[in-house]
Amino acid sequence: MGNWLVNHWLSVLFLVSWLGLNIFLFVYVFLNYEKSDKYYYTREILGTALALARASALCLNFNSMVILIPVCRNLLSFLRGTCSFCNHTLRKPLDHNLTFHKLVAYMICIFTAIHIIAHLFNFERYSRSQQAMDGSLASVLSSLFHPEKEDSWLNPIQSPNVTVMYAAFTSIAGLTGVVATVALVLMVTSAMEFIRRNYFELFWYTHHLFIIYIICLGIHGLGGIVRGQTEESMSESHPRNCSYSFHEWDKYERSCRSPHFVGQPPESWKWILAPIAFYIFERILRFYRSRQKVVITKVVMHPCKVLELQMRKRGFTMGIGQYIFVNCPSISFLEWHPFTLTSAPEEEFFSIHIRAAGDWTENLIRTFEQQHSPMPRIEVDGPFGTVSEDVFQYEVAVLVGAGIGVTPFASFLKSIWYKFQRAHNKLKTQKIYFYWICRETGAFAWFNNLLNSLEQEMDELGKPDFLNYRLFLTGWDSNIAGHAALNFDRATDVLTGLKQKTSFGRPMWDNEFSRIATAHPKSVVGVFLCGPPTLAKSLRKCCRRYSSLDPRKVQFYFNKETF
């Protein structure tokens, strides 16, 4: 735990600050509405539910302002580039942007639930006080009406015949609240891991309901349902002095005047205006870049239905491990899908590898398999930075890819090859451990040439130990295993043709980390993963377990690719 805090102290500080701000805003507004004389009469009808509704509303505004920032990809790429020479701990929060985005969304859900429940109680109490015939203060307040000031009422339910449901669904606040809540529920449920992985199109389209959510939030307070006593009225008849003699209001010259009330002006738009403006600028920038012409220079179909596209685009510059968003208008005009760049910055083109994993990718692969002329138009937005850009910042790098998750490391390994070709000897990275876990033997095919070239290059430069790679096959059968066993004495692997033999099963991570820690007792080791959450959990545990509490000894820093 201590080592984890050392590695993530800035992320923890940021998270604690955000939680602290939520708690402060909630408590501050709650106490204000619970104690303020301005809402003395409002509390007579609504009780504590008033303060709960208003406190949760402010926290909703705050988090609705914050939630757009983590998905402004250009801003994050700019900050990552600005912090490229900073300590990796300072860049760590940028790598958790989507995690923070989800946490803010969960917080919005919590405060939405509090806000809805509180206002359901409020409408019920408004209705009861309007129907009450007992002459209580609440019933008197509900019947107040000033002809000279038609909007100086306290109870939004003006008639005892109006039901709670009718009042809730016909008011601006009630109607916009229902629409915003439905949009929020659809966005949150469609963002679940299972749906996002298997039905990305559903997630993509549904998530754009945030536009409706933001619009409803902006106009939610226009009705001014929550009302407080006016300053002028309080100066004439202070509630703490006059509430006990409410039966005598306006009867005598010296008696208290009946109070006047005013609704609160809408405030939500003030919170969301700046991030909305920033997000609109972000979208305009994305649109401008996506409209620039992309030339497809080469199309390669690899085994296991993996499509490689090599492209060029004017003014396109990339770094290792970055990703782009791709759109094919002939398939879907609105859908944009993220793909990691597999080319190196030193190459004259940029490339991506696409595996069939859903309707959109299957349609794209099918389109290119048909080899129509001319080729379908491709639009590209990016590139955007990720945690994989930091690979060269570590003395020792451990790269772990699962299936198509190897793509970020293809860019890195290609760049290494080019750097050694050009006698680039200023690399901070002195050792690379590369692990690739695949279900099918065909998946290794498109990566073999690169690994083979790296093997030869390292041998020629006298650095055969610079790259240590292990390939693991998890989808093998008895025929494959028997064939490999019969040819075990061959100089090259029977499945891949590489010097390193393919292993069957999954890596024993404790053994691997123990070996690396022993080989590099005083090094800073960066562990990079592009793979499933279960594998991330195992690697994260190993990083904590094998990192020394002594900062002068081996330290493992876990980094997971997310986009």
Curated annotation (Swiss-Prot):
Residues 396-535 are annotated as: Interaction with NOXO1. It comes from the Eukaryota. The chain crosses the membrane at residues 9-31, 45-69, 103-123, 168-188, 207-227, 396-416. FAD binds at residues 337-343. It is an enzyme of class 1 (oxidoreductase). Residues 32-44, 124-167, 228-395 are extracellular. It is found in: Cell projection, Invadopodium membrane; Cell membrane. Phosphorylation at Thr-429 mediated by PKC/PRKBC positively regulates its interaction with NOXA1 and enzyme activity. Heme binds at residues 101, 115, 208, 220. Residues 54-282 form the Ferric oxidoreductase domain. Residues 1-8, 70-102, 189-206, 417-563 are cytoplasmic. Expressed in vascular smooth muscle cells. Glycans are attached at residues 161, 241. It catalyses: NADPH + 2 O2 = 2 superoxide + NADP(+) + H(+). Changing residue 429 to A: Loss of catalytic activity. This is NADPH oxidase 1. It comes from Rattus norvegicus (Rat).
